[in-house]
């Protein structure tokens, strides 16, 4: 959708400073959460690892290793003329601080002990955020909600900011459905832990969550992609795109409460971890009742290395879709998760949603078209 407002892009030599609020934080505060009022139903698709969990069951990474590895993806440098790595910023940021910068991870791949070796200058960021992740002192470990780190200390398994998001959504009187979307094997455990927290008040920081009256569908679903079709299954439900994707869009939009689906890692890997093999997301710019928002740390502005495949309907009620680039939906329906800020700022998820809602409404009002243009490299992070 057309967007006449201009967002200032950082100059090439500007580094986004790391503050206590996380990656790329600025002096100015985030936009406020909108006042309660009638809005589109929110369908929130939320990744698990490095989005609301600081661990990775697929790669068997614990809390320290997962956070250490994440830092290698948000710290930037380049190879100099002598063929040696040269750091371009002492700050961590989701976007490159200048033209030509590449992340350490993109250049060298995963390196165990990144902040104890070449990334030692970022060790302070690691330690600061590990402290923020600590399980409350004096509170007994919980088999589902806490996890013992490699250093023997207890940490939150699910970020507290996720539970704060649930509080905020209910207090704002939003109509919403929250769907976990993961390639990994943690989904059953997450659904169980969240259900117990919402029904039994098991979380020491959020004992009042049962008052929210939210339901959790603990049956893990699956979304399987092939050249022929996309098939969604959950329990006895089965929906296919064989006759068009509209049925899948309507199924996801009709949900309530919380649930989750395991997506197809092999399909993404087969497509070289690019947009075309990513987790499918259908968006209908003609639907006045629903807005889909997808949080994932692996959403990238480069479609050759991003994790969500957005498909936009071309006409009202139709079946035809086109693939949208990440930049078209960035901060409208796609949010590149800032793990450091999600750890340090309890209102992070709610503010990101508010930004997406604001951008969506502006774009609809300015042209009736959904898609934004050039929203990439914004400073809202």
Language-model features, listed with the residues they occupy:
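Alpha-helical substrate-recognition element adjacent to the catalytic core
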Residues: 2-201, 205-211, 323-381
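C-terminal cap/substrate-recognition subdomain and adjoining C-terminal extension
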Residues: 36, 172, 184-381
């Amino acid at each position: 959708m057309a967007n006449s407002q201009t967002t200032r892009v950082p100059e090439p030599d500007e580094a986004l400073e790391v503050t206590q609020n996380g990656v790329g934080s600025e002096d100015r505060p985030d936009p406020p959460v909108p006042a309660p009022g009638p809005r589109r139903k929110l369908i929130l698709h939320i990744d698990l690892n490095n989005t609301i969990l600081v661990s990775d069951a697929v790669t068997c990474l614990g809390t320290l290793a997962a956070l250490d590895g994440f830092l290698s993806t948000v710290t930037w440098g380049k190879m100099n003329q002598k063929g040696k790595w040269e750091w371009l910023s002492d700050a961590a940021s989701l976007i490159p601080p200048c033209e030509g910068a590449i992340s350490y991870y993109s250049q060298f791949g995963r390196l165990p002990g990144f902040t104890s070796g070449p990334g030692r200058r970022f060790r302070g960021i690691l330690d600061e955020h590990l402290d923020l992740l600590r399980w409350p002192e004096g509170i007994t470990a919980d088999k589902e909600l806490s996890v013992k780190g490699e250093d023997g200390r207890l940490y939150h398994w699910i970020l507290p900011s996720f539970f704060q998001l649930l509080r905020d959504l209910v207090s704002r009187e939003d109509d919403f459905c929250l769907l976990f979307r993961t390639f990994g094997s943690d989904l059953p455990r997450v659904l169980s832990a969240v259900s117990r927290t919402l029904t039994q008040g098991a979380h020491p920081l959020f004992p009042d969550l049962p008052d929210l009256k939210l339901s959790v569908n603990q049956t893990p679903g699956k979304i399987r992609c092939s050249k022929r079709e996309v098939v969604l299954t959950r329990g006895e439900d089965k929906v296919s795109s064989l006759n068009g994707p509209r049925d899948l869009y309507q199924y996801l939009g009709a949900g309530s409460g919380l649930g989750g689906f395991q997506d197809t890692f092999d399909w993404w890997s087969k497509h070289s971890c690019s947009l075309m093999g990513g987790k499918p997301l259908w968006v209908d710019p003609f639907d006045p009742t629903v807005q889909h928002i997808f949080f994932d740390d692996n959403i990238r502005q480069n479609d050759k290395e991003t994790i969500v495949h957005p498909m936009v309907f071309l006409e009202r009620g139709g079946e035809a879709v086109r693939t949208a680039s990440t930049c078209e939906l960035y901060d409208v329906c796609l949010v590149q998760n800032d793990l450091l800020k999600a750890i340090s700022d309890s209102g992070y998820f709610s503010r990101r949603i508010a930004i997406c809602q604001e951008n969506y409404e502006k774009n609809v009002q300015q042209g009736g078209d959904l898609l934004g243009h050039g929203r990439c490299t914004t400073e809202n992070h």
